[in-house]
A protein has these predicted regions:
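Active-site neighborhood of HAD-like aspartate-dependent phosphohydrolases
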Residues: 1-49
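Conserved Lys-Pro-Asp/Glu-containing loop-to-beta segment of HAD-superfamily phosphomonoesterases
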Residues: 5, 115-142
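Short, solvent-exposed loop/turn segments at secondary-structure junctions
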Residues: 12-15, 20-21, 86-90, 119-123, ...
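Substrate-recognition element of Asp-dependent hydrolases with the DxDx(T/V) motif
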Residues: 59-61, 65-97, 104
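Metal-dependent catalytic neighborhoods of phosphoester/phosphodiester hydrolases
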Residues: 92-99, 123-127
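Structural recognition of alpha->loop->beta junctions
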Residues: 100-115, 169-170
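Acidic, Mg2+-coordinating phosphoryl-transfer loop and its flanking beta/alpha structural elements
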Residues: 132-166
Length: 170
């Protein structure tokens, strides 16, 4: 397979969102992939996240994320981009996009293209089978594949590297 574009999601792939919710907010985050979330759980989580005005810039790297990113970015360069969602305006996270840019530039690369969108806009970046999305959320992978792209659900950096190798990309 030849890669036209490789898009990295941030939260849960590169940035450890769940650890941030636990350590910065003192809360166990509701499952992002499960069906066991209530609107009340989400509201409480976002209320606590909002207390740290620059929450996204304070997140840690996911285990192995830097090595995974460097391996892919080192091979594909400007064919790699960040495709990350930000919270809806009702969540009051006015600095989310700016903080994600700062985070990527500080920890990964100042040169990589950043695409900051609402979650449901991600599939609009898909141009076909050779357009790859690495994302931790099942629903994002499902939507991406429905648009004809290749989705890799990130379980861990090692697992994602193995999947990229299976596709002949690494």
């Amino acid at each position: 397979m030849e890669a036209e574009k490789i898009y990295f999601d941030m939260d849960g792939v590169l940035a450890d969102f769940e650890r941030g919710v636990q350590e910065i907010c003192g809360l166990n985050p509701p499952s992002q992939n499960g069906k066991h979330r209530s609107p009340g759980e989400d509201d409480e989580m976002w209320a606590r996240i909002r207390l740290d005005e620059h929450f996204y810039d304070h997140l840690e790297l996911m285990p192995g994320a830097k090595e995974m990113f460097d391996a892919v970015y080192g091979k594909y360069g400007d064919r790699c981009e960040i495709l990350t969602g930000i919270p809806k305006p009702k969540r009051g996270m006015v600095f989310a996009g700016e903080d994600k840019i700062k985070w990527v530039h500080r920890l990964l690369s100042e040169d990589i293209n950043m695409n900051i969108v609402f979650r449901e806009e991600k599939p609009q970046f898909c141009t076909g089978k050779n357009c790859i999305l690495i994302d931790d959320m099942e629903s994002n992978i499902r939507d991406w594949e429905a648009y004809g792209g290749t989705g890799i659900q990130n379980i861990s950096a090692g697992d994602t590297i193995d999947k990229l190798k299976e596709l002949g990309l690494l």
